[in-house]
Amino acid sequence: ATSALTLVAAQFEQLPEDVQTANVRKVLTFDRSYEYAVLDLPPALTKLTEKVITLSDSVFVPIELGTFAIQGIPAVTGALANCNAKFGGCIVNKFDKENPADTELLEFLKCTLGNKVLNTTIPFSRVIKNSFSYKLTAKEYMKWTAAAQAYEDLAAEIIERLGEE
């Protein structure tokens, strides 16, 4: 899947600027019966991600706690500012509450970014990894797990935050 995403991004980069923008606008034009659209992009600042960010109202950045990931946040928020996109916040992903390092890094992140760190954390879970193999959401695969419930809570928190804007 990663090599396929790389190929798509590489092909996108070869398109003329106006065609890139038109294609991204098409993707972002969705059925108006929906209030929100979530686009999951590769974790790289390519022209594709920059175009999508530029045309988005708010951007939430998932982060797996680790020193390098936290050190990369200023680059991401700087890129968002350059695209005039609103930084909705960080979503802590693959969080292990039993790991003292994760707990310390979460506290550091909260001290650094304050309310830009969402309260909902997505726990590390094999269920999520396994659900991808079956092309199911975590909720469809095993709806009673903590990870599946965390995604429900995350959606509610994001909707609440966007409603406050």
Model-derived segments and spans:
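Acidic, proline/glycine-rich intrinsically disordered inter-domain spacer in sigma factors
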Residues: 10-15, 100, 139-143
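Short, conserved glycine- and acidic-residue-centered signature motifs
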Residues: 17-20, 69, 147
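C-terminal boundary of histidine-terminating zinc-finger modules
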Residues: 131-153
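P-loop/Walker-type NTP enzyme "switch/lid" segment
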Residues: 1-35, 131-133
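Conserved catalytic-core segment of NTP-binding enzymes
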Residues: 29-126
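Glycine-rich, flexible loop/turn motifs
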Residues: 8, 118, 124, 134-137
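C-terminal alpha-helix
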Residues: 153-165
